[in-house]
Amino acid sequence: MKKYLGIVLMALVIAGCTSRVPQTEQPATIEPAVPTPSKPQLPPSESQPLPTPPKIQVPVLDWSAAVTPLVGQMVKTDGIARGSILLLNKLKNNTNGSLQTAQATTALYNALASSGQFTMVSREQLGVARQSLGLSEEDSLESRSKAVGLARYVGAQYVLYADASGDVKSPELSMQLMLVQTGEIVWSGNGTVRQQ
Protein backbone atom coordinates (compact mmCIF):
# COMPACT_ATOMS: atom_id res chain seq x y z
CA MET A 1 0.00 0.00 0.00
CA LYS A 2 2.81 2.41 0.84
CA LYS A 3 4.48 1.68 -2.47
CA TYR A 4 1.25 2.39 -4.31
CA LEU A 5 0.79 5.69 -2.45
CA GLY A 6 4.40 6.69 -3.20
CA ILE A 7 3.96 5.97 -6.92
CA VAL A 8 0.74 8.01 -7.09
CA LEU A 9 2.39 10.91 -5.27
CA MET A 10 5.35 10.88 -7.67
CA ALA A 11 3.01 10.77 -10.67
CA LEU A 12 1.14 13.84 -9.38
CA VAL A 13 4.36 15.75 -8.82
CA ILE A 14 5.63 14.93 -12.30
CA ALA A 15 2.26 15.77 -13.89
CA GLY A 16 2.19 19.09 -12.05
CA CYS A 17 5.59 20.06 -13.44
CA THR A 18 4.52 19.62 -17.05
CA SER A 19 1.23 21.47 -16.71
CA ARG A 20 2.79 24.79 -15.66
CA VAL A 21 2.45 27.49 -18.23
CA PRO A 22 5.87 28.81 -19.18
CA GLN A 23 6.30 32.49 -18.49
CA THR A 24 7.72 34.48 -21.29
CA GLU A 25 10.44 36.94 -20.46
CA GLN A 26 12.47 39.19 -22.61
CA PRO A 27 15.89 37.71 -23.17
CA ALA A 28 18.66 39.65 -21.52
CA THR A 29 20.63 41.79 -23.89
CA ILE A 30 24.32 41.14 -23.91
CA GLU A 31 26.56 44.03 -24.78
CA PRO A 32 29.98 43.12 -26.06
CA ALA A 33 32.85 44.37 -23.96
CA VAL A 34 34.83 47.11 -25.62
CA PRO A 35 38.52 46.76 -24.84
CA THR A 36 40.15 49.95 -23.62
CA PRO A 37 43.57 50.66 -25.05
CA SER A 38 46.27 50.51 -22.41
CA LYS A 39 49.92 51.39 -22.50
CA PRO A 40 52.16 48.35 -22.52
CA GLN A 41 54.31 47.99 -19.40
CA LEU A 42 57.93 48.29 -20.39
CA PRO A 43 60.75 47.15 -18.16
CA PRO A 44 62.80 50.02 -16.75
CA SER A 45 65.59 51.07 -19.02
CA GLU A 46 69.15 50.39 -18.04
CA SER A 47 69.88 54.09 -17.81
CA GLN A 48 67.27 54.49 -15.09
CA PRO A 49 68.60 53.09 -11.78
CA LEU A 50 66.35 50.98 -9.62
CA PRO A 51 65.61 52.35 -6.17
CA THR A 52 67.54 50.62 -3.41
CA PRO A 53 65.43 48.83 -0.83
CA PRO A 54 65.65 50.23 2.69
CA LYS A 55 68.11 48.48 4.96
CA ILE A 56 66.91 46.85 8.13
CA GLN A 57 68.69 48.73 10.83
CA VAL A 58 69.80 46.49 13.64
CA PRO A 59 70.86 48.59 16.61
CA VAL A 60 74.49 48.29 17.63
CA LEU A 61 74.39 47.34 21.30
CA ASP A 62 77.21 47.39 23.84
CA TRP A 63 76.90 43.82 25.09
CA SER A 64 80.19 43.68 26.96
CA ALA A 65 79.26 46.74 29.06
CA ALA A 66 76.02 44.99 30.03
CA VAL A 67 77.36 41.51 30.76
CA THR A 68 80.57 42.44 32.61
CA PRO A 69 78.86 43.74 35.81
CA LEU A 70 76.46 40.77 35.80
CA VAL A 71 79.35 38.32 35.50
CA GLY A 72 81.09 40.23 38.33
CA GLN A 73 78.05 39.66 40.56
CA MET A 74 77.78 36.02 39.55
CA VAL A 75 81.38 35.08 40.38
CA LYS A 76 80.86 36.39 43.94
CA THR A 77 78.10 33.82 44.55
CA ASP A 78 78.81 31.58 47.53
CA GLY A 79 79.38 27.90 46.86
CA ILE A 80 80.83 28.19 43.35
CA ALA A 81 84.25 26.55 43.34
CA ARG A 82 86.95 28.22 41.28
CA GLY A 83 87.56 26.29 38.06
CA SER A 84 84.04 24.83 37.89
CA ILE A 85 83.09 23.79 34.37
CA LEU A 86 80.43 26.03 32.82
CA LEU A 87 78.29 25.43 29.74
CA LEU A 88 77.06 28.69 28.19
CA ASN A 89 73.73 28.50 26.42
CA LYS A 90 73.13 30.82 23.44
CA LEU A 91 71.37 34.08 24.23
CA LYS A 92 67.64 33.78 23.58
CA ASN A 93 65.97 36.72 21.80
CA ASN A 94 62.55 37.58 23.26
CA THR A 95 62.58 41.22 22.11
CA ASN A 96 60.23 42.92 19.69
CA GLY A 97 62.81 42.79 16.87
CA SER A 98 65.97 41.24 15.51
CA LEU A 99 69.11 41.00 17.65
CA GLN A 100 72.60 39.82 16.83
CA THR A 101 72.58 37.06 19.42
CA ALA A 102 75.95 35.67 18.32
CA GLN A 103 77.65 38.94 19.36
CA ALA A 104 75.90 38.86 22.73
CA THR A 105 76.86 35.23 23.34
CA THR A 106 80.48 35.96 22.37
CA ALA A 107 80.63 38.97 24.73
CA LEU A 108 79.23 36.83 27.54
CA TYR A 109 81.65 33.98 26.78
CA ASN A 110 84.62 36.39 26.81
CA ALA A 111 83.53 38.02 30.09
CA LEU A 112 83.15 34.62 31.75
CA ALA A 113 86.48 33.34 30.43
CA SER A 114 88.34 36.46 31.59
CA SER A 115 86.80 36.25 35.08
CA GLY A 116 88.91 33.17 35.83
CA GLN A 117 86.15 31.71 38.02
CA PHE A 118 84.98 29.12 35.48
CA THR A 119 86.49 26.71 33.02
CA MET A 120 84.38 27.23 29.92
CA VAL A 121 83.20 24.39 27.70
CA SER A 122 84.85 25.21 24.37
CA ARG A 123 82.74 25.81 21.29
CA GLU A 124 84.44 22.91 19.54
CA GLN A 125 83.71 20.53 22.42
CA LEU A 126 80.12 21.77 22.49
CA GLY A 127 79.76 21.18 18.73
CA VAL A 128 81.03 17.60 19.02
CA ALA A 129 78.71 16.92 21.96
CA ARG A 130 75.71 18.34 20.09
CA GLN A 131 76.47 16.08 17.13
CA SER A 132 76.87 13.03 19.36
CA LEU A 133 73.53 13.68 21.06
CA GLY A 134 71.73 14.49 17.78
CA LEU A 135 71.10 18.16 18.61
CA SER A 136 71.25 20.73 15.82
CA GLU A 137 73.54 23.74 15.97
CA GLU A 138 70.45 25.99 15.99
CA ASP A 139 68.97 24.33 19.09
CA SER A 140 69.13 26.98 21.82
CA LEU A 141 68.59 24.41 24.59
CA GLU A 142 65.39 26.06 25.79
CA SER A 143 64.41 22.72 27.21
CA ARG A 144 66.16 22.40 30.56
CA SER A 145 66.33 18.64 30.16
CA LYS A 146 68.29 19.01 26.89
CA ALA A 147 70.66 21.47 28.55
CA VAL A 148 71.20 19.20 31.55
CA GLY A 149 71.79 16.20 29.27
CA LEU A 150 74.33 18.13 27.21
CA ALA A 151 76.03 19.53 30.33
CA ARG A 152 76.36 16.04 31.82
CA TYR A 153 77.74 14.75 28.52
CA VAL A 154 80.54 17.38 28.51
CA GLY A 155 81.07 17.15 32.28
CA ALA A 156 79.86 20.67 33.12
CA GLN A 157 78.74 21.50 36.66
CA TYR A 158 76.82 24.67 35.68
CA VAL A 159 74.71 25.94 32.77
CA LEU A 160 74.22 29.68 32.20
CA TYR A 161 71.03 30.85 30.49
CA ALA A 162 70.81 34.37 29.05
CA ASP A 163 67.66 36.04 27.74
CA ALA A 164 67.06 39.44 26.10
CA SER A 165 63.51 40.82 26.26
CA GLY A 166 61.59 44.06 25.82
CA ASP A 167 62.45 46.78 23.30
CA VAL A 168 65.09 45.80 20.74
CA LYS A 169 66.74 49.25 21.01
CA SER A 170 67.43 48.82 24.72
CA PRO A 171 66.72 45.22 25.75
CA GLU A 172 66.56 43.89 29.28
CA LEU A 173 69.12 41.15 29.85
CA SER A 174 68.41 38.42 32.39
CA MET A 175 70.76 35.59 33.28
CA GLN A 176 70.33 32.43 35.35
CA LEU A 177 73.07 30.10 36.58
CA MET A 178 71.83 26.55 37.10
CA LEU A 179 73.56 23.78 39.03
CA VAL A 180 73.46 20.73 36.74
CA GLN A 181 73.41 18.12 39.50
CA THR A 182 70.20 19.38 41.13
CA GLY A 183 68.67 21.75 38.55
CA GLU A 184 68.69 24.52 41.18
CA ILE A 185 69.08 28.15 40.06
CA VAL A 186 72.00 29.27 42.22
CA TRP A 187 72.21 32.83 40.85
CA SER A 188 70.16 35.17 38.68
CA GLY A 189 70.68 38.75 37.60
CA ASN A 190 69.21 41.44 35.36
CA GLY A 191 70.57 44.42 33.48
CA THR A 192 69.84 46.76 30.59
CA VAL A 193 71.80 46.73 27.35
CA ARG A 194 72.52 50.20 25.92
CA GLN A 195 73.36 51.22 22.38
CA GLN A 196 76.97 52.06 21.56
Curated annotation (Swiss-Prot):
UniProt biased composition (Pro residues): 34-43
Give the signal peptide, or none.
1-16
One of the protein's GO biological processes:
regulation of cell shape
Presence of keyword rRNA-binding: no
Record localization: Cell outer membrane
In this UniProt entry, which residues carry a covalently attached lipid of the kind N-palmitoyl cysteine? C17
Region annotation (Disordered) ranges: 24-54
Q: Which GO terms describe its cellular component?
A: periplasmic side of cell outer membrane
The topology of this chain with respect to the membrane is: Lipid-anchor
Q: Which domain of life is it from?
A: Bacteria
User: A GO molecular-function term, please?
Assistant: enzyme regulator activity
Assembly and partners are described as: Interacts with PBP1b.
In terms of PANTHER family, this protein maps to: PENICILLIN-BINDING PROTEIN ACTIVATOR LPOB (PTHR40593:SF1)
Q: What is this protein called?
A: Penicillin-binding protein activator LpoB
